[in-house]
Swiss-Prot record:
This is Leucyl/phenylalanyl-tRNA--protein transferase. It holds the Pfam family Leu_Phe_trans. GO terms for cellular component: cytoplasm. It is found in: Cytoplasm. The lineage of its organism: Bacteria, Pseudomonadati, Thermodesulfobacteriota, Desulfovibrionia, Desulfovibrionales. Functions in the N-end rule pathway of protein degradation where it conjugates Leu, Phe and, less efficiently, Met from aminoacyl-tRNAs to the N-termini of proteins containing an N-terminal arginine or lysine. Its main location: cytoplasm. Keywords: Acyltransferase, Cytoplasm, Transferase. Belongs to the L/F-transferase family. GO terms for molecular function: leucyl-tRNA--protein transferase activity. GO terms for biological process: protein catabolic process. Its EC number is 2.3.2.6. Coiled coil: none annotated. Gene3D superfamilies: Leucyl/phenylalanyl-tRNA-protein transferase, C-terminal domain (3.40.630.70), Leucyl/phenylalanyl-tRNA-protein transferase, N-terminal domain (3.30.70.3550). It comes from Lawsonia intracellularis (strain PHE/MN1-00).
Length: 228
């Protein structure tokens, strides 16, 4: 039976009770306290307007590690032709709005509900959610957002309206994080696209071990608008 969350924002059921697809619990809210509690436990929300809030902890877990990260040669060639500029934390609301509203191939609707959008904007104001923006002059043409805790970054969503803009955002983010000794980027579930960059599948238990180390060995709360 799927567990229902209580009013205690810190409570989540044991991860071993998750279904085979990673679904762990439903209900609760998207308060900063509950979201941060979830991320530190290896849990994230993923649902749509037709369901209650659903909480997931997949096994295996897909992550990018600095030692395995690679840029495919075809993407390297594409990025060399780009004339875009990249910023960080300059347009978080615009990025998450684009991620929520732009249509995607083979996807109906969006999992970034209005409540989800407002929750991550609040996390951004608190210094935990961050965005990468890709610009063509003054036009936002791509980007991504996610959550940073300690030395772990949890990727949430990306978008592009110009070719290769989201690829540039991902490569820029990874290189930026590795330069600050981040331990990994959590990609949650594998996709053909992310596996091209050297993503690794690890067990839930190994992920939790890495996560515990990452969130206790450094701080990533933004001290300036530009920093993680």
């Amino acid at each position: 039976m799927l567990s229902a969350l209580s009013n205690d924002p810190m409570y989540f059921p044991p991860l071993e009770t998750a279904f085979d697809n990673g679904l762990l619990a439903y209900g609760g809210d998207l308060s900063p306290q509950r979201l941060l509690s979830a991320y530190t436990k290896g849990i994230f929300p993923w649902y749509d307007n037709n369901s209650p809030i659903l909480w997931w902890s997949p096994d295996p877990r897909c992550i990018l590690l600095p030692e395995n990260f690679r840029i495919p040669k075809t993407i390297q060639r594409e990025l060399k032709k780009c004339t875009f500029s990249v910023t960080i934390n300059n347009a978080f609301t615009e990025v998450i709005t684009a991620c929520a509203t732009l249509p995607r191939t083979k996807q109906k609707g969006t999992w970034i509900t209005q409540d989800m959008k407002m929750a991550y904007i609040q996390l951004h104001k608190l210094g935990f959610s961050h965005s990468i923006e890709v610009w063509d002059n003054s036009t936002l043409v791509g980007g991504l957002y996610g959550v940073a805790l300690g030395k772990a970054f949890f990727g949430e969503s990306m978008f592009h309206i110009a070719p290769h803009a989201s690829k540039l955002a991902l490569v820029w983010l990874a290189q930026y994080l590795w330069s600050y000794n981040f331990d990994f980027i959590d990609c949650q579930m594998p996709t053909t696209h992310i596996m091209r960059y050297g993503a690794t599948l690890i067990s839930r238990n190994e992920f939790l071990t890495r996560l515990t180390i990452a969130v206790t060995t450094g701080t990533s709360q933004a001290s300036t608008k530009e920093a993680l």
